[in-house]
Amino acid sequence: MNQSKRILRTVYLSLFLIGLFMLINDIFSSWMLGSKSSDKELQFDLNKSFDDNKMLLSKSNNFNLIDKAQDIIVETGIYFATFSTFRGNLVSLKLKNHLNLEKDPTDLINVDYKNEPFFDVSFDYLVEDLFLYKKIDDFNHEFKAYFKNNGKTYEYVKKYTFSKKNEYLMRFEVIVNGLEDYNLLDIDSYKITFSSQIERLSDKAKLQYNNYLSQIIYYDNKLKYGKDDLRINNPKWIGSSTKYFEVLVSKENMEVEFKKEKGILKSFIVNNVINKKNISDKFFIYAGPKDNRYLDIFDKNSDNTFGLSDIAFGMSVEKSLWYLIQVPMQMVMQVFYDVIPNWGLSIIFLTIVVRILIFPLTFKGFRATAELSKLQPKMKELQVKFKHDPKKLNEEMGRLYKEEGVNPLGGCFPIILQLPIFFALYSLVNNLFLLRGANFIPGWIDDLSIGDSVYHFGYKLYFVSWTDIRILPFIMMFTQLGSTIVSSNIDLKNLGAQQKFLYFGMPIMFFFILYNMPSGLLIYWITTNIFTILQQYYIKMHLS
């Protein structure tokens, strides 16, 4: 095997593993993708408290105090919450501080509330009339209704409590009183259908954010994904999760089951009511960024408004195989950001620091390659001499390597050892929530979590799934080619047609693979390529 082929195979083996890693990551993300109403409007005083006695009397006379559905909008420091008097449900929950591509607040509970509400409680179907609303204060909101069975009227209340500290958490309570002689239609439990679409994105947004929706559950100290017919007793929490946001639900002593209905996986919370005179169940709902800065505060009761502890919401953030490498990398990025508040520059500086740290490995690999190249004349002589005897050729080659003290794989190992660092950086830059919406170069790279854009088509190109003209992928391709040429030290004139195809085809292949990747990832890749070119020139000068 001549020197150029060996170097090419080493480089392409590394690139193949990188491509395989990204392909598996993309497939895994895609895999996870997995009544009564009134259209009349109502105008009434939302701040007026309801009269329980008057309401109860009106129910007994089958008269509706409120016979028209009403949306009630509540604003907190972090949410725009919309409730409906139809079943007293939360129908929209928008994050004020996190905008989507259309520059609108991200909606975490974007559902068809009349047909598929966010928290669909079994009792809702027993209520014939609309719920009455009462604002306790800015953080506490109550909905009340009554339902009848066997001539008796039962009080049914839903309470919503928001955090006073602008935490991404709310408490939801289900209260049913007067069950001493009522067995809830001979059932021993009631169900809540948990449904959260977490922002029904436009086709552009789905492609840009590489978005997926997965049903997740945490039990036995493990993060699992929901599947059909799965039933779990007393998990820590269940939830719906995307790349950057999630809605998680926690309750003591709950049972959860997953069922596929019309091809859609749904989750159900089963609540026991055996021997209960009254029902008073509390659910804690996290609805916000998929970011440990906001999730981990619920593991210590002194850190959050509701006094929760050991909820383990932070375990919803998937940990990659390279997590231990990613942690110090993110810390270094944060240090750079604190000095210069620009995440794009932080990525560049982090990349340079990493490349400097692994320079000894790079230098060792290049030196091994240089030592091997000195043997080319002797290797060619052996190849000519034993061209009809491959077995003898291998024996003589081995003897030559041993006599000269050269390891033919010496240039491969340093490259392979660097791959975990690349994978860790790739995973960090591709998934870090802090990069969502982070501006690097205004007017060009406005969001490091999606691809850059200089022109938007308004439609998707069929064969390549392109929606925009992007500049970074072209820069990446040319710098990748330059990096490969400099690193390989190959005379292009001596390459065969097949080798030239592989030589130029690999950067082109990665151009298509990475075209729609987050711009933050491409900035890392381009910085690596440029640093490699400069580094290889320095090494060549040093060795010469």
Swiss-Prot record:
Pfam families, A to Z: 60KD_IMP
Keyword Zinc-finger among UniProt keywords: no
InterPro entries: Membr_insert_YidC, YidC/ALB3/OXA1/COX18, YidC/Oxa/ALB_C, YidC_ALB_C, YidC_periplasmic_sf
Topology in the lipid bilayer: Multi-pass membrane protein
Function comment: Required for the insertion and/or proper folding and/or complex formation of integral membrane proteins into the membrane. Involved in integration of membrane proteins that insert both dependently and independently of the Sec translocase complex, as well as at least some lipoproteins. Aids folding of multispanning membrane proteins.
Subunit record text: Interacts with the Sec translocase complex via SecD. Specifically interacts with transmembrane segments of nascent integral membrane proteins during membrane integration.
Family (UniProt): Belongs to the OXA1/ALB3/YidC family. Type 1 subfamily.
Annotated protein name in UniProt: Membrane protein insertase YidC
